[in-house]
């Protein structure tokens, strides 16, 4: 069965749950990936650039999860979990946005992991500002959009799937 790369917005607590239980459900069953609608949206750019735009959407969704305000350990660090899932569990939802996909079932395991990206400590202040501004940015406020853009421009550290236990323990 063919597999596709899906970017799952997450939080540090979700990483800890994945390490502890061996599986995790994508919040509300949503993920982001290179979909036909996203490819059609871009008139130029290679596959990697298009995939990066889907990744950025997942990192913005991570900010929305952080905006809920229930993250105790790292309330200002975005997390994106990259997984390779069977095509059969993925349904593109262009009505929700070009890179948006619905996952059924929404659950994935550590075996599906391809990569983990987490904000570095130096990005926390910028991400904190973006978290406060993200809803206002959605309404078109230019200053809020700039704050969110500043956070999206920040480097997220890459971790190999085998580093998950150390990432959870040492951070």
Regions found by a protein language model. Name each.
Residues 74-76, 83-171:
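Glycine-rich, aromatic-bearing surface loops/beta-hairpins
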Residues 30-44, 71-89:
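Short, structured protein-protein interaction patches enriched in aromatics and acidic/basic residues
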Residues 14-20, 63-70:
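Intrinsically disordered, low-complexity boundary segments flanking structured domains
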């Amino acid at each position: 069965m063919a597999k596709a790369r899906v970017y799952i917005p997450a939080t540090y607590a979700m990483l800890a749950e994945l390490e502890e239980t061996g599986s995790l459900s994508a919040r509300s069953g949503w993920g982001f990936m290179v979909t036909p609608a996203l490819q059609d949206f871009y008139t130029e750019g290679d596959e990697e650039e298009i995939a990066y735009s889907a990744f950025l959407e997942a990192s913005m969704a991570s900010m929305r999860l952080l905006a809920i305000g229930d993250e105790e350990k790292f309330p200002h660090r975005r997390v994106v979990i990259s997984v390779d899932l069977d095509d059969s569990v993925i349904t593109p939802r262009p009505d929700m946005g070009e890179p948006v996909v619905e996952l059924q079932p929404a659950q994935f395991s550590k075996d599906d992991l391809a990569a983990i990206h987490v904000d570095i400590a130096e990005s926390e202040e910028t991400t904190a500002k973006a978290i406060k501004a993200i809803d206002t940015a959605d309404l078109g406020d230019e200053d809020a959009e700039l704050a969110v853009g500043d956070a999206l421009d920040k480097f997220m550290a890459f971790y190999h799937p085998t580093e998950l236990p150390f990432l959870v323990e040492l951070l």
